[in-house]
């Protein structure tokens, strides 16, 4: 009898185990800090995950009931570095890619990078194995990856974003996707003037329509065969969009249940803070008025920063000589300039450990979502120098909430930067009070990882198909062209 009960228990557990394919090719550390936490949460809930990804972050996890297999797209980091180097031609001061740089031509190289990754021998061998999966999870930032939902049909297709969603993601879900004032396109860098905003929204819509409907479709058919569906057809397969974000940052956008805001901070459960080295601990403790931490994230190639921008930073650091400045920067930069005596540079700092140190009084950063999560966790006021993508919008929201000062990175001077840093330090009590207020708003009803797993399991169990129309979380307007949405009505 006992043996029978054990067998039934094992069978029940096995029935609840899903085989999940996660296609996560973008070689950006901040993205994979989030994806790794999600994959680990799935494995801890006894799901088996096969991850197609670059090698920059190891997803290995031992002694869990679910297995993690990693398929290395090991050309991706090299290709990504080529992409970043090529983008230097249109980046202002070598770092700022504002909305004027967001064009189909500039972003085509990103799609070509994905194509090269999926041509990788490891990926080709995996595709030839004809394995089956219950779900395919892809990055929300690139429609090209949706082809895996077609290749492994009828698996449920899920998109995940390390932060904000794209307008195209919301269109596919049938959510409110576009408004020049209330729900601006996440690629926008300028938010003044309703007429200019509307024109920018229209241009961005057309640029990404060109990227998807023509160029991506052509590459998909070249790579996977003439019968490969179009991007618009592939979007129809998406049943769930997971956003590692609290909706307050997204202006509390109205969305259907197929769009789930996880609350943000998903990566924080994965990254326990380590102790600082003894030398760095001593340097911080000896700082006269405190320490300022400066980091522009993992996606900025500091070697491509223009010398004039480096000099602007150094002039500001000199004026802040009573503070120790910790500056995350590649080794080639300090080797080429004379550093002020109050500046300590390293290629990498344990950011959470630094921000948690009692002497750190300000954080100069690019307004990356994961970095701001860590600053809020540590109650450190921020000075934002946004450089690309969703950073402009996020920096704007942080300033609106009173937890940061935001400057125009393309034109900021040393005097302006010094003044902003001095302001957040001088008004530290007020900034920390507003940080505490924002943290209370961001408080989770459920842990982000728990919520992500719950909804992943739901769309797998209640698999949607045309014979079961009730089994969907999407709206009836999901993925409908605007011309049909506004102009075609059933009679």
From Swiss-Prot:
Signal peptide: 1-17
Organism: Choristoneura fumiferana nuclear polyhedrosis virus (CfMNPV)
Homology family: Belongs to the UDP-glycosyltransferase family.
Higher taxonomy: Viruses, Viruses incertae sedis, Naldaviricetes, Lefavirales, Baculoviridae
Protein name listed in UniProt: Ecdysteroid UDP-glucosyltransferase
Keyword Signal: yes
Biological role: Catalyzes the transfer of glucose from UDP-glucose to ecdysteroids which are insect molting hormones. Expression of egt interferes with normal insect development and block molting.
EC numbers for this chain: 2.4.1.-
MF (Gene Ontology): UDP-glycosyltransferase activity
Keyword field contains Signal: yes
């Amino acid at each position: 009898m006992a043996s029978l009960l054990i067998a039934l228990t094992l069978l029940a557990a096995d029935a609840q185990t899903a085989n999940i394919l996660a296609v996560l090719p973008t070689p950006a550390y901040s993205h994979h800090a989030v994806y790794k936490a999600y994959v680990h949460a799935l494995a801890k809930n006894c799901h088996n995950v096969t991850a197609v990804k670059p090698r920059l972050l190891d997803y290995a996890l031992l002694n869990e009931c679910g297995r993690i297999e990693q398929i290395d797209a090991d050309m991706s980091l090299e290709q990504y570095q080529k992409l970043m180097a090529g983008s230097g031609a249109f980046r202002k001061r070598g770092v700022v890619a504002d909305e004027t740089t967001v064009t189909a031509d500039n972003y085509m190289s990103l799609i070509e990078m994905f194509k090269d990754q999926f041509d990788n021998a490891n990926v080709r061998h995996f595709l030839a194995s004809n394995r089956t999966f219950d779900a395919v999870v892809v990055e929300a930032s690139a429609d090209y990856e949706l082809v895996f939902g077609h290749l492994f049909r009828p698996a449920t297709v899920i998109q995940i974003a390390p932060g904000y969603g794209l307008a195209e993601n919301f269109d596919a879900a049938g959510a409110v996707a576009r408004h020049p004032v209330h729900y601006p396109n996440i690629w926008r860098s300028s938010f003044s003037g309703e007429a200019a905003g509307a024109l920018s929204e229209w241009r961005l819509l057309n640029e990404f329509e060109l990227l998807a409907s023509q160029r991506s479709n052509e590459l998909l058919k070249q790579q996977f065969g003439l019968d490969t569906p179009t991007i618009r057809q592939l979007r129809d397969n998406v049943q769930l969009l997971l956003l590692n974000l609290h909706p307050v940052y997204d202006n509390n956008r109205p969305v259907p249940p197929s769009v789930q805001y996880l609350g943000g901070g998903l990566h924080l459960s994965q990254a326990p803070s380590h102790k600082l080295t003894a030398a760095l601990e001593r340097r911080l403790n000896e700082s006269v008025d405190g320490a300022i931490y400066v980091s522009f994230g993992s996606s900025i190639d500091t070697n491509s920063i223009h010398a004039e921008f480096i000099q602007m930073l150094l002039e500001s650091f000199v004026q802040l000589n009573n503070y120790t400045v910790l500056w995350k920067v590649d080794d080639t930069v300090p080797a080429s300039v004379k550093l002020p005596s109050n500046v300590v540079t390293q290629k990498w700092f344990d950011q959470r450990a630094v921000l948690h140190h009692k002497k750190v009084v300000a954080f100069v950063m690019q307004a990356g979502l994961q970095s701001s999560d860590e600053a809020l966790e540590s109650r450190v006021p921020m000075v934002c120098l946004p450089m690309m993508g969703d950073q402009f919008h996020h920096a704007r929201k942080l300033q609106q909430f009173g937890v940061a000062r935001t400057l125009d990175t393309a034109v900021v001077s040393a005097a302006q930067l010094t003044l902003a840093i001095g302001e957040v330090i001088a008004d530290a009590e007020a900034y920390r009070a507003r940080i505490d207020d924002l943290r209370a708003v961001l408080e989770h009803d459920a842990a982000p990882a728990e919520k992500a797993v719950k909804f992943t399991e739901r769309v797998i169990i209640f698999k949607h198909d045309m014979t079961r129309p009730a089994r969907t979380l999407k709206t009836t307007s999901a993925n409908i062209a605007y011309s049909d949405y506004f102009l075609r009505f059933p009679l």
